[in-house]
Amino acid sequence: MDVLPSSYRLLAALPARITSRRPLPSQLRALRTSPPQWRFTNIRAISASAPKIDRSKSKLFKDADEAVADIQPGSTILSAGFGLCGVADTLIQAMKKRGPKSLHSLTAVSNNAGIEDVGGLAHLTKNGQVEKLIISFLGNNKALEKQYLSGGIEIELCPQGTLAERIRAGGAGIPAFYTPTAVDTLVAEGKVPAKFNEEGKVVGYGKKREVREFGGKRYLMEEALTGDVAIVRAARVDEAGNCVFRYTTKAFGPIMAKAARLTIVEAEEIVPIGTFDANDIDLPGIFVDRIVPSTAPKNIEVKKLREEESASTSSTTNPPSSNKISSRERIARRAAKELKHGYYCNLGVGIPTLAASFVPPSIKVWLQSENGILGMGPYPTERELDADIINAGKETVTLLPGASTFDSAESFGMIRGGHVDVSILGALQVSASGDLANYMVPGKVFKGMGGAMDLVSNPEATKVVVATEHMAKDGSSKIVGECNLPLTGARCVSTIITELCVFEVNRQRGRLTLTEMAPGVSVSQVRGATDAKFEVSPDLRSME
């Protein structure tokens, strides 16, 4: 006869032991008669400033006025969009309608602050409803600029990629992270002006960052950003809150929706549940709490067009037609040679963007725009114009066959992660060590750094090329021994291209080597125009 192990007999008897009635201790007997101290509910409210969310009710609201009616003063608002593209103007106008007595002291987080009397957060800042902004760039908002410099509003300026990652981290429940962006800059030191008094004197600065070393490289610790309310514009939304975005409107929309305690989406089209294929959804409905119809028109910040007959599938601009080569054209022509077949490239505004015009048709490059495009094409014709497709300079552009669009966190992950082969930027100053200054001149209006600090954050993987005129407007050299302007990045530039010559930079040794000269230019002429010391390559050649 088989005998069961004692452990088995104990397990078999366990249910009976658990469910049998036994006398309770007196203290537990007292608790048994008291009402429970918990309850299940469909209502969710995490922050005192965040409106309550009732999961049992429909997400559809009659209009924007109803959807923003319970936003509290002092709330943090995450406002999606890039420039004027993808901005939730219907919701912003409804918030403005409530007025500064009902809705005030707001902290607003966005990439830009819009344009006065046109669109974006400018409606709220002009109305005195915003106390603090967290943005990467002021843009063309003169009224906000004046308000900032006279103490009317506090502005925390943050590198664009860092801003996007702080928001993404907030939505993912990650309190902080380390980034190579902005090491050795005013951002790291906590010296970016944030608050002025009425006389225009700086009375407040940004927060100093913690610096830590990983693998021999230094990184800054950045804290996550979350909001009480996110306001987002989407192209199509179903009644469950699933969203579909068009092109570059998704720059900040999806990540902000995930980082807020309550998300309101204004939709150009509201459709029944089941309309979308699951593969087509950009933002799942779990992140959306309220849906309203979008009634505000789309705005275009910088309308750029090309003529029908000059359409090109390999450039973002049209090359100059003059027979005389200007300084800018000479620089752009040489910069184009840095763009090799199959490369993924990011081009800054101005001369760097012009370089794309001189890439031969036989060379295929993929242009990346940090607001969320890979495969950017030329300016559109009037027929091709689409307000939802813009570049990092807020200009209207097109997409080439094979292009993709994505949010800003994805975009700057490509950049910081070293997946971009070449980044070409302009400069105010470049040092012999490859230090770059290109976003701020002390004493002049400071509009922000945008994405420049992110673009130079991984020079070991992404080649950073500076394309700039050799001399500044005041006649001083831009090629210096040491930068005296605030740095965008330290030891990050590998090649410098000017109208006079080309320098290769040894970032480790802090040395410049003259490798090419423009026709008709002498070494002595280059020395006279260059503050930094440099060596001359034994293989010095003509700049083509």
Identify the residue ranges that each predicted region occupies:
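N-terminal mitochondrial targeting presequence
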Residues: 1-56
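Structural beta-sheet core signal
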Residues: 108-110, 265, 367, 466
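Catalytic or ion-translocation cores adjacent to nucleophile or general acid/base/metal-coordination motifs
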Residues: 109, 366-380
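Substrate-recognition/specificity elements adjacent to catalytic centers across diverse enzyme folds
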Residues: 350-353
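Conserved phosphate- and dinucleotide-binding cores of soluble alpha/beta proteins
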Residues: 55-62, 68, 83-99, 115-125, ...
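Short, T/G/N/S-enriched strand-turn elements that build extracellular solenoid repeat scaffolds
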Residues: 122-123, 356-358
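N-terminal glycine-/serine-/threonine-rich phosphate-binding loop
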Residues: 38-108, 307-344, 364-365
